[in-house]
Design a protein with these regions (language model features):
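Generic detector of contiguous secondary-structure segments
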Residues: 53-71
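A generic structural signal for short hydrophobic patches within well-formed alpha-helices
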Residues: 8-9, 38, 73, 118-119
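Histidine- and aromatic-rich ligand-binding microenvironments
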Residues: 3-4, 33-34, 93-94, 115
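Short active-site oxyanion
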Residues: 27-31, 62-64, 105, 109
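Active-site neighborhoods of divalent-metal-dependent phosphate/nucleic-acid chemistry enzymes
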Residues: 66-110
């Protein structure tokens, strides 16, 4: 499973349905996230005052963090052009979303997320 910021924040902040999402994480054979998504996650966690608990959660689940290479950056750009904020599509994917979607698309793994932005984009 490719991790998106929304999923990890929902679990950490115990948003409605968080237990089910945590079980999904526990059942996943692979947990992976883009370094671009990780950067967004850490910035958002810092701004919400939950950076240390988020770092603890990341240590517990220990996802493989995939570096952003040229291929992944180009894929994320392509996703942004189609579905990104300000591009006229209802999905309005943000920076971290584009990297999560690009990695899921490239590695052919399911995308773990909360909300309907990715659904609007067809993920």
């Amino acid at each position: 499973m490719i991790l998106d910021t929304s999923l990890l924040l929902a679990i950490l902040q115990r948003e409605p349905g968080w237990e089910q999402h945590q079980q999904t994480l526990e059942r996943a054979e692979v947990l992976r996230m883009s370094a671009g998504t990780l950067q967004e996650l850490l910035l958002v966690a810092h701004c919400r005052g939950v950076l240390e608990p988020m770092q603890t959660l990341l240590e517990l689940i220990d996802p493989d963090v995939v570096p952003v290479d040229g291929d992944l950056a180009e894929r994320a750009l392509g996703i942004f052009k189609r579905f990104g904020k300000g591009q006229g599509h209802p999905a309005q994917l943000n920076f971290g979303d584009c990297f999560a979607a690009a990695l899921a698309e490239r590695d052919q793994l399911p995308l773990g997320y909360i909300g309907d932005d990715f659904t609007k984009a067809g993920f």
